[in-house]
UniProtKB/Swiss-Prot annotation:
Name of one Pfam family that matches: Col-Pyo_DNase
Keywords: Antibiotic, Antimicrobial, Bacteriocin, Endonuclease, Hydrolase, Nuclease
A molecular function GO annotation: signaling receptor binding
GO biological process: one example: cytolysis
Membership in a protein family: Belongs to the colicin/pyosin nuclease family.
Subunit: Purified pyocin S1 makes up a complex of the two (large and small) proteins. The large protein, but not the pyocin complex, shows in vitro DNase activity.
Protein name, per record: Pyocin-S1
Biological role stated in the UniProt entry: Causes breakdown of chromosomal DNA as well as complete inhibition of lipid synthesis in sensitive cells.
Organism placement in taxonomy: Bacteria, Pseudomonadati, Pseudomonadota, Gammaproteobacteria, Pseudomonadales
Length: 618
């Protein structure tokens, strides 16, 4: 008697579980915030399926073409239901898995938005890598099982092939075939689940990437705005500094032909007895010098004014330190002998010079500076004076000249003249006329005219910078001679190393280039700041007098003078007129950029040799 079907075919339950790793953004959404965490998902067919042992369906009167497909259909349905359930829970599983991964990294509340996104991108990237690996494993599984389309195969097709396999290779082959079919179906559904998980993760990755790009773009825009603002600030600051430097180095004068002294960046220096008295004092000095030279030609100087600093009367905004006050004096160049026929424009274009029989000089002594007219001989006092042409600046309404500095660290000098009216080619009716500001008065210094008294100049004169300024023909302004403060009267620090000396140091002072500054003296003076050239010179000779070796080379008379800051005497054959002491010579002229206090630029020479050097003698 045939057994019931239930006794012949039975099913053990097939366990299907969820597994997988997925990531998403904040709270399952797409914004920036606490990001989601991974969940393991996928179908697992590793448990035994419990297929009915195969003997011979014919022996029990069962048609395998009918009942095997029923068994397969039931198995496939169970797997499909598990897949559908896992698919419904996919997004929640993805979110939970991402939340778990994020929590493992600790709180993100103190992180910047960009750091939160970068952290999220790392988590999602890791999840994508894991899912792609599992997707690949399931795809390989399908390939190993014959690369069939397990999702579309019919139960009848599977049953027929399973029975055929069993009839040929026995019951175990039959059950292995059905196991492989279910493994393949499970792998196929896993491929779908992992593909969907990867798609979900990729959406999150794209969202986070876009958010990162937005934050970075905003940061870049902010950085550009800040850079532009900083560049603008620096440009404005530089413009202010340049304007301040320009103002501090501008000598402003009226263009009325009067004799005026002006302090750079401050204004006109007041004259104790009025401007007319200063002009008269210069005229008297020139006349006295002319009479003296007519009877006994030589290098003579005639003082005409003294400049004193009176900080007690200076305004608070004005610099009250005499050492830092730079000044210039301007006067009619014709009074110093400028030939009326000279073409100043042509000379200036050629960067040339014009010889003058007289020039101005100044010498600081303590808090007072003496201004003098000095005769020129081409040797002790050069005749050549550089020429510059002034140009009208329609923006400022001033005539201006810019004089490049002779040293790299110093800014250029700017001279301005305020005309009584615009030049002839400027039509005041066509535009709003520029009204220049009146030149202010500097109350921190006073010029006092003195009686003209001639004296033989006691040395080779290192003249301050001076210029002859020409003006356009339509300006109505006569050529002006301008003398600047002697650069040797400007404070400075000693530099240079000097040279080692031995034997009779000043023996070289009467020949060749002269005697170098001894290195041991340079070591003592280097780095010290001196009020002016006179201050340096005095400290130099005091240092020499106190040197145990060098002091042995001088007689008691010279040593006494040197200890008071004076220079030692020279023998009669090396004297020149009233010049009887050792002199210090700048190898490169100060006017040519030679350092005033650069001890490598200084040599000690006798008066006779000094004159020969200036004559070009070897």
């Amino acid at each position: 008697m045939a057994r019931p079907i239930a006794d012949l075919i039975h099913f053990n339950s097939t366990t299907v579980t969820a597994s997988g790793d997925v990531y998403y953004g904040p709270g399952g959404g797409t914004g920036i915030g606490p990001i989601a965490r991974p969940i393991e998902h996928g179908l697992d067919s590793s448990t035994e399926n419990g297929w009915q042992e195969f003997e011979s369906y014919a022996d029990v009167g069962v048609d395998p073409r009918r009942y095997v497909p029923l068994q397969v259909k039931e198995k496939r349905r169970e797997i499909e239901l598990q897949f559908r359930d896992a698919e419904k829970k996919l997004e929640a599983s993805v979110q939970a898995e991402l939340d778990k991964a994020d929590a493992a990294l600790g709180p993100a509340k103190n992180l910047a938005p960009l750091d939160v996104i970068n952290r999220s991108l790392t988590i999602v990237g890791n999840a994508l890598q894991q899912k792609n690996q599992k997707l690949l494993l399931n795809q390989k599984k399908i390939t190993s099982l014959g690369a069939k389309n397990f999702l579309t195969r019919t139960a009848e097709e599977i049953g027929e092939q399973a029975v055929r396999e069993g009839n040929i290779n026995g019951p175990e082959a039959y059950m292995r075939f059905l196991d492989r079919e279910m493994e393949g179906l499970t792998a196929a559904y896993n491929v779908k689940l992992f593909t969907e998980a990867i798609s979900s993760l990729q959406i999150r990755m794209n969202t986070l990437t876009a958010a990162k790009a937005s934050i970075e773009a905003a940061a870049a825009n902010k950085a550009r705005e800040q850079a532009a603002a900083e560049a603008k600030r620096k440009a404005e600051e530089q413009a202010r500094q340049q304007a301040a430097i320009r103002a501090a180095n501008t000598y402003a004068m009226p263009a009325n032909g009067s004799v005026v002294a002006t302090a750079a960046g401050r204004g006109l220096i007041q004259v104790a007895q009025g401007a007319a008295s200063l002009a008269q004092a210069i005229s008297d000095a020139i006349a006295v010098l002319g009479r003296v030279l007519a009877s006994a030609p030589s290098v003579m100087a005639v003082g005409f004014a003294s400049l004193t600093y009176s900080s007690r009367t200076a305004e608070q905004w004005q610099d009250q330190t005499p050492d830092s006050v730079r000044y210039a004096l301007g006067m009619d160049a014709a009074k110093l002998g400028l030939p009326p026929s000279v073409n100043l424009n042509a000379v200036a274009k050629a960067s040339g010079t014009v010889d003058l029989p007289m020039r101005l000089t100044n010498e600081a002594r303590g808090n007072t500076t003496t201004l003098s007219v000095v005769s020129t001989d081409g040797v002790s006092v050069p005749k050549a004076v550089p020429v510059r042409m002034a140009a009208y600046n329609a923006t400022t309404g001033l005539y201006e000249v810019t004089v490049p500095s002779t040293t790299a660290e110093a800014p250029p000098l700017i001279l301005t003249w305020t005309p009584a009216s615009p030049p002839g080619n400027q039509n005041p009716s066509s535009t709003t006329p520029v009204v220049p500001k009146p030149v202010p008065v500097y109350e921190g210094a006073t010029l006092t005219p003195v009686k003209a008294t001639p004296e033989t100049y006691p040395g080779v004169i290192t003249l301050p910078e001076d210029l002859i300024i020409g003006f356009p023909a339509d300006s109505g302004i006569k050529p002006i001679y301008v003398m600047f403060r002697d650069p040797r009267d400007v404070p400075g620090a000693a530099t240079g190393k000097g040279q080692p000396v031995s034997g009779n140091w000043l023996g070289a002072a009467s020949q060749g280039e002269g005697a170098p500054i001894p290195s041991q003296i340079a070591d003592k003076l280097r780095g010290k700041t001196f009020k002016n050239w006179r201050d340096f010179r005095e400290q130099f000779w005091i240092a020499v007098a106190n040197d145990p070796e060098l002091s042995k080379q001088f007689n008691p008379g010279s040593l006494a003078v040197m200890r008071d800051g004076g220079a030692p005497y020279v023998r009669e054959s090396e004297q020149a007129g009233g010049r009887i002491k050792i002199e210090i010579h700048h190898k490169v002229r100060v006017a040519d950029g030679g350092g005033v206090y650069n001890m490598g630029n200084l040599v000690a020479v006798t008066p006779k040799r000094h004159i020969e050097i200036h004559k070009g003698g070897k």
